[in-house]
Design a protein with these regions (language model features):
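Active-site microenvironment of metallo-dependent hydrolases
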Residues: 1-177
Length: 177
């Protein structure tokens, strides 16, 4: 746009994506893969730094999925990830139920997935199940989902999920593994 400063990456071959020139705020800062000028980034305004305002304390209980049966197992709908695809499949899986709660099944790569509202408006936590992450222990959480920028957390158990969300809150956003 005329009159605006741009960040541009020029490549000669889209298959290699090797930059020949890099422009930062309209200035040439790298040429032929060599930095020729530093890229000073200014301070972020305060309103960008404090955006994780959880309305309620997130604990293990926040990620519990109640079982609607007294049986030791139940069928649930699972998001079945397709490697390197944005479109996924729907899977019906049988998961264990213990003490009135549906549990994840990490042995079969079925984990809990949750979205935690981060702006202090509703305090909502939506929990489901996902297969295909390959996570065998622990949890990961991040706050940079392009659709909504709430906190997304996936984990083998609820305690690790809650701890990951706590770290995201303490960092005021980011990625926690």
């Amino acid at each position: 746009t005329p009159g605006r400063l741009a960040d541009i990456l020029l490549v000669e071959d889209l298959r290699e994506m090797k930059p020949s020139q890099v422009y930062f705020e309209g200035r040439l800062v790298a040429k032929d893969c060599k930095l020729i000028q530093t890229c000073e980034v200014g301070e972020y305004p305060e309103w960008l730094k404090n955006t994780v305002k959880l309305k309620q304390l997130i604990t293990e209980k926040s990620f519990r999925v109640p079982a609607r049966t007294d049986r030791p197992q139940t069928q649930v709908t699972v998001i079945d990830l397709i490697d390197r695809q944005i479109i996924n499949k729907r899977l019906i899986a049988t998961l264990p139920c213990v003490n009135g709660e549906i549990l994840a099944d990490p042995v079969h790569d079925i984990l809990k997935l949750a979205i935690v509202e981060r702006y202090g408006k509703t305090g909502g936590v939506g929990v489901g199940f996902v297969r295909g992450f390959g996570l065998r222990e622990g949890a990961m959480a991040y706050s940079m989902s392009h659709d909504h920028h709430n906190i997304v957390v996936v984990g083998v158990n609820e305690l690790d999920m809650a701890q990951s969300v706590k770290v995201i809150q303490e960092m005021q956003g980011g990625l926690c593994v």
